[in-house]
Amino acid sequence: PTSGGGWNWEYLRAVNFYLSHSVRCDDVDAREHFDGIARFFRAYFYFEKVKRFGEVPWFDRELSSTDPELFRPRDSRDFIMDKILDDLTYAINNISDKKDLYNVTHWTALALKSRICLFEGTYRKYHGIPGYEKFLDECATASKLFIDNAPYAIYKTGAQPYRDLFSSMNAIEEEVILARDYDRAQNVM
């Protein structure tokens, strides 16, 4: 399609462009941290594509608009999902675990891994596709790590905590894993 429909790959190109040029950074810790964030977003990008289209081509390097790779066939769902897990594992192992409401952290990557693995495991199970156990096991492992170690808790303050959680003008830091802040005066997120 020429517009809409979710077939836009600009975002992936930006991520792959960053990853192909990040090797220039001499600070290895910073590079690995930001490479982890880039790979988190690539995993999320591909998760959205797989949910919408199923099998799609996997690109993990920067391509030009004339690259013949752009016209190759789709990769298998197994291949794509394994690559998504590779990206998330890298992200989990390299992104800072310092709690930060407005930036991707180790905990954000762990939560995304849990969500993606739950989706893929149940999709495979209820569509009769083999291999669902791997994804459900990965989901359980990631979820257990998150529940046991993440610096988050269920918001229980106030007379109606569930309502207050969603009606507050500020993000409730104890429960929110990743947020976007909206500034009404400037009309920006």
Question: Which residue ranges define each predicted feature?
Answer:
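An aromatic- and glycine-enriched ligand-binding surface/loop that stacks and positions planar moieties
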Residues: 1, 81, 85, 89-90, ...
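Proline-centered turn/helix-capping motifs that create local helix->coil transitions or kinks
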Residues: 49-58, 154, 186
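Aromatic-lined, polymer-binding surfaces characteristic
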Residues: 46, 55, 59, 100-111
